[in-house]
Amino acid sequence: MAQACWGCYPWLVLICACAWGHPKSLNQREDVRNCSTSPPYLPVTAVNTTAQLTALREQMLTQNLSAYIIPDTDAHMSEYIGECDQRRAWITGFIGSAGIAVVTERKAALWTDSRYWTQAERQMDCNWELHKEVSTGHIVTWLLTEIPVGGRVGFDPFLFSIDSWESYDVALQDADRELVSITVNLVDLVWGSERPPLPNAPIYALQEAFAGSTWQEKVSNIRSQMQKHHERPTAVLLSALDETAWLFNLRSSDIPYNPFFYSYTLLTDSSIRLFANKSRFSSETLQYLNSSCNSSMCVQLEDYSQIRDSIQAYTSGDVKIWIGTRYTSYGLYEVIPKEKLVEDDYSPVMITKAVKNSREQALLKASHVRDAVAVIRYLAWLEKNVPTGTVDEFSGAKRVEEFRGEEEFFSGPSFETISASGLNAALAHYSPTKELHRKLSSDEMYLLDSGGQYWDGTTDITRTVHWGTPSAFQKEAYTRVLIGNIDLSRLVFPAATSGRVVEAFARKALWDVGLNYGHGTGHGIGNFLCVHEWPVGFQYGNIPMAEGMFTSIEPGYYQDGEFGIRLEDVALVVEAKTKYPGTYLTFEVVSLVPYDRKLIDVSLLSPEQLQYLNRYYQAIREKVGPELQRRGLLEELSWLQRHTEPLSARAAPTTSLGSLMTVSALAILGWSV
């Protein structure tokens, strides 16, 4: 799935407006609000927020606040958040996944990116202003026009990252305003008994067959890293939910699409303290954690809400706490004396988790074989049913989930399926709903970006297809996206190279003709954990590539108002076999679904690219074919064989991307690793 670093392009508003009919100005449409009329016009989808805003402002008065900031995250800086943390959605009525709300004594404003502008106009009432420039700087600029000198801006420190706190604090202080940390969330006070409760599903241990190492081995590894660190920390604080889940091989279902549970861990050189809801652990799980003893390999369970007090108590001694600043909230950071902090971008657990051992690699590969069966079944089913006019984006998304549900060890989807036909596919993160969707047609391209959570691995794959006659431009764009996928996948590069250095290889074929895409090229992926697993990937802030990492490779192209293309595979970083000695790496693709032959212009492929593609198709036949045969899926096996027939060159390629690509891309990026 393409990561949400899509630029805020104004044309996306027009696309959304066109998606289900001819474009109209916002003032003429009945599905969005019009706050310029008297009385204001509100669609039936708009939420009346007057009562909650009045109550919130009363709470602000008790704290002497001029403004209150409401972000869209949780105390663990999670990408996906649970219902009980949907504070920004509840106060605004806007349920999109990205946005920051600010409430002052007289005004309320929401900042969100271009993916959600139309949705916000449909869901918010006229109590709210919509702002389209999303950054701390723009929010602070607005605040300075709305609150007086000396004004106090409140925030929940558990919902701010350390970097977010610092950026707001510096900007407001420079303008003689004050950023005030308030540990009791004011929205929660207003939400009251209507706020969804914290989840209470059982927290369970993964079966040994699905764990790469025992939790005792992992704890010993992290303690060893503590001892080797030059600052000799006495403890590691784990705040990200996947860190604790990975460390103890524990899972649950608190977060949509992610098998996590609300938790923290304080791992010291002599104790293990797990902060969670104690009532959710069965006697078997407690025994698994050795919770009834007091040695250094016994897990002491403490209440989730006690983490801040426990950190304060621990730091009263002669200690040092090692934190990863990217996922530690300011609410914990502010109570740790600075001389007792050891700070890195990512915790040792986050770094260790990113490199899969041989057992974890085998598990992830196995999950991708079964996932390929489900996706191939779906594509074969579409090929037969789309011409009948009976399939739409929403029913298609449900159908692919049904196919995955028949696979062994399936636990659920790994994110909301992106099932997009025609112009909707030009929206990189579009997902259909039961109410709003388009029919799939043989006359249009169709993009499917989907994935599954299995006990042995997490999957994420994107394929774009066309069942009719694609235009020459569609074929060229598709083929250039495919070339980018191939050239990055087959790249050989020095060990410890940053992903951002090689990212241009996925774009070069598009750049050659003036095309590009606005989202990230790839992200890490976990073993029954996050579908977007940091810190692996091709962006700034990602750690250097290392053998054993898994990453997606997903170039794309999006033609405004017409179609979208994305081709995404998951790949394992492996050691490359080179002619001369040296430590070099390359990628081994583990996604196993063929591309659409109808959309490939073979004349654009170099001999090396064509050879790679045919070898990939042979690998699909060898790894997925026997599974289809074993299960008696003969129709799907026939489909697979047809779609993986070797391709042959029809014309000489107009240019070779080999050495030219290497020289130009590295010159652009300065080859700084």
Curated annotation (Swiss-Prot):
One of its GO terms (molecular function) is metal ion binding. Mn(2+) binds at residue 449. N-glycosylated. It is a lipid-anchor; GPI-anchor. Its cofactor is Zn(2+). Inhibited by apstatin and the metal ion chelator EDTA. Potently inhibited by the converting enzyme inhibitors cilazaprilat; enalaprilat; L155,212; ramiprilat and YS 980. Also inhibited to a lesser extent by indolaprilat; quinaprilat; spiraprilat; captopril and zofenoprilat. Glycans are attached at residues 34, 48, 64, 277, 290, 294. Residues 650-673 form a propeptide. Keywords: Aminopeptidase, Cell membrane, Glycoprotein, GPI-anchor, Hydrolase, Lipoprotein, Membrane, Metal-binding, Metalloprotease, Protease, Signal, Zinc. It comes from the Eukaryota. It holds the Pfam family Peptidase_M24. Its main location: membrane. Its EC number is 3.4.11.9. PROSITE patterns: PROLINE_PEPTIDASE. The keyword Lipoprotein applies. Residues 1-21 form the signal peptide. A lipid is attached at residue 649 (GPI-anchor amidated alanine). It catalyses: Release of any N-terminal amino acid, including proline, that is linked to proline, even from a dipeptide or tripeptide. Zn(2+) 1 binds at residues 449, 460, 568. One of its GO terms (cellular component) is plasma membrane. Homotrimer. Belongs to the peptidase M24B family. This is Xaa-Pro aminopeptidase 2. It comes from Sus scrofa.
